[in-house]
Amino acid sequence: MAEKNLPKDLTENRKEIDQIDRKLLNLIHERSKLVINAGKIKKKSGDKTFYRPDREASLIKTLQKKNKSSIPAENIKFIFKEIISACFTLEKKNKGLLSRS
């Protein structure tokens, strides 16, 4: 079905989804800037261990508990593990020399 032939309410719904996606992208960008800054702070303080699996697990568990959507907890875990992993890679790339332990 061509976009122009879609019912108006579906078109409006998709526009709202697109707006939310842009907001999510902006929030991920803001998160990535904070992660990079945290990495700089850690580097400056001499903290060479920047990956903390216990913090990641705690964060994900908290997010799963706060989840009020119909998205299953396992999917929430997957989504946030991906976001954390992408930010971890970015932090590692920007810091350059920290070890993962």
Model regions and ranges:
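Domain-level signature for soluble enzymes in the chorismate/prephenate branch of the shikimate pathway
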Residues: 1-101
